[in-house]
Amino acid sequence: MSNYWLNIYKPRGISSAQLVSIVKKILGKTKIGHAGTLDVEAEGILPFAVGEATKLIHLLIDARKTYIFTIKFGMQTNSGDCAGKVIATKDCIPSQEEAYAVCSKFIGNVTQIPPAFSALKVNGVRAYKLAREGKKVELKPRNITIYDLKCLNFDEKNATATYYTECSKGTYIRTLAEDLALSLQSLGFVIELRRTQVGIFKEENAIRIKSPDEITKNALEEKSIKIEAILDDILVLDATDSQAQQIKYGQKCLFNYEKDFRHLAKFAYREEFKGNTERSTTAYTLVREDASTGLTYKLPLEVEFGKMSVDLLWVRYKGTLLAIGSLNKSCFNSLRVFNLTQDFF
């Protein structure tokens, strides 16, 4: 098996690039990528894509992520974490009540300025390189979403608080920590940071590796996750021989809504159940049973009548991932085509 995901746990003290080198030494010559760089001082989930799974990395980068982080109040560092130099201090330390209550202010859509010590580029140069040289770094604000934020623990003696957050892509926890502290009329920096989840990948079943000698290639592959795992919550269509051939060779491919739709899950609607139809804030849906499997699925009525475009879906051929793309009415537009099977014509 050469196309799969690995749920790797990056330890604190090594870079994401160093962990990539370790995994490459174990697996040998194969295409490898990862979804979402972690700082050297951070630890946690770093999903690895192997082989054709690298074509899906962009989906994981867009996925929600969860973190647990600890803030030290009363000081600010130039990097936003304990690796930097202290550049300011303040005697004002928040109370436990304040540390808990401030969370509600940050839930929702937030504008955040990335830290100077980041991998973002300024005129083609990494921001952290400019910051290390003492140069002024100006980065544009970006819009992010904080889905959840709560205080887990407050240590008055050490002036620290530990928080949990679920957030969108592009969120910098070091900046979030600084903004939390400022909102509490204090200063702060991150002393511990752990990423606990990226999409479907969670820390409780992650593989922990510190050196290439700790695990063999076979043992690592035994812990692999199928390439389709991250696609479980989006629409999937099953292609016939002729449809699969059209997709493989980049030709126009049409699907019949009545015959080809098999699965639709997790539509982002809040629905109110009404008989055998469901009313949504954005669309109507129809409950239908798939006679071939006995399973019940929900189809938007717009899709049922071929009036709705689908931004992202995937196509199977003989049970194996063939392509991902979009659907414009009944026409499939391929974004990525995968070579996972030799069973082709």
From Swiss-Prot:
One Pfam family cited in the UniProt record for this chain: TruB_C_2
EC main group: isomerase
GO MF annotations, alphabetized: RNA binding; tRNA pseudouridine(55) synthase activity
Catalytic activity: uridine(55) in tRNA = pseudouridine(55) in tRNA
Catalytic residue list: 39 (nucleophile)
UniProt keyword Lipid biosynthesis present: no
Keyword Chaperone tagged: no
InterPro entries: PsdUridine_synth_cat_dom_sf, PsdUridine_synth_N, RPE1, tRNA_psdUridine_synth_TruB, TruB_C
This protein's UniProt keywords: Isomerase, tRNA processing
Superkingdom of origin: Bacteria
EC number: 5.4.99.25
GO biological process: mRNA pseudouridine synthesis; tRNA pseudouridine synthesis
HAMAP family attached to this UniProt entry: TruB_bact
Family label: Belongs to the pseudouridine synthase TruB family. Type 1 subfamily.
Functional description taken from the UniProt entry: Responsible for synthesis of pseudouridine from uracil-55 in the psi GC loop of transfer RNAs.
Name the record gives this protein: tRNA pseudouridine synthase B
